[in-house]
């Protein structure tokens, strides 16, 4: 299969775990950055890593499970985001974590490890399901959950007991931003994977929520991060939220 993105042509034979639109958006964002060392974790099939390498980045791949990895001329390291990653301090200029943080038992540990192994001023590109778009907020109202809960039969028979396949930590953007800032990251940019045209029917509800935020007290705005959760990239965002951050001097 061939596809053109960021002025390069690449070929692959596997299926990306993250949405194609998420891969394409991250490639577009990273194409504007100076070339350097990048860690792709969890790398999954290695498709994104292959694209980044063809763009001129020095790529390292890491995942808790190597059985899905399908890029023969790239090496994969085994690492668990809930524990210490197998890299020295200050190893990477960039870190890409697509659809991984919500699968961890301890997302704070993962962010702390990212901070440790990245160089000062390094850029992080992190994606996670957008649990706070208006569509998912309505779903939560009726179901009481932001993410589907797998059955024990699925975990046992299909996932072979691997809980890391489930969304163990479905984090909304305010909490994820809070954790990242606690470990010295500064948020630079938010992106969505794609627009969802059917959300136009939910615009009246979005306007009502924004009106509530406008007249809320300053304290309420701050503690609930209302200015952040009502911005277009989140409340009108797609299925996936893409966060670009930078490691500061702290930590």
Short names for language-model regions:
Residues 1-3, 248-251:
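Short, Lys/Arg-enriched, disordered terminal segments
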Residues 4-6, 97:
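Generic detection of intrinsically disordered/low-complexity segments and helix-coil linkers/edges
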Residues 6-21, 25, 47, 51, ...:
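S-adenosyl-L-methionine-dependent methyltransferase catalytic module, highlighting the catalytic core
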Residues 24-140, 241-247:
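Conserved SAM-binding loop
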């Amino acid at each position: 299969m061939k596809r053109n993105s960021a002025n390069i042509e690449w070929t692959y034979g596997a299926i990306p775990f993250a949405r194609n639109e998420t891969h394409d958006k991250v490639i577009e964002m990273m194409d504007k950055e100076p070339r350097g060392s990048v860690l792709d974790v969890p790398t999954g099939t290695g498709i994104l890593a292959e694209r980044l390498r063809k763009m001129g980045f020095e790529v390292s791949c890491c995942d808790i499970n190597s059985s899905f990895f399908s890029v023969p001329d790239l090496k994969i390291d085994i690492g668990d985001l809930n524990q210490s990653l197998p890299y020295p301090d200050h190893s990477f200029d960039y870190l890409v974590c697509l659809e991984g943080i919500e699968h961890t038992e301890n997302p704070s540990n993962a962010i702390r490890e990212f901070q440790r192994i990245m160089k000062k001023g390094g850029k992080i590109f992190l994606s996670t399901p957008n649990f706070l778009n208006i569509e998912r907020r309505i779903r939560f109202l009726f179901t009481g959950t932001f993410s589907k809960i797998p059955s024990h039969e699925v975990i046992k028979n299909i996932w072979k007991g691997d809980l890391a396949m489930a969304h163990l930590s479905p984090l909304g953007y305010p909490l994820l931003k809070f954790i990242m800032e606690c470990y010295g990251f500064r948020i630079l940019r938010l992106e969505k994977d794609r627009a969802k045209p059917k959300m136009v029917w939910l615009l009246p509800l979005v306007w009502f929520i924004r009106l509530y935020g406008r007249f809320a007290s300053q304290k309420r705005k701050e503690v609930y991060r209302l200015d952040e959760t009502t911005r277009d990239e989140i409340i009108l965002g797609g299925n996936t939220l893409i966060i670009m951050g930078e490691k500061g001097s702290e930590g």
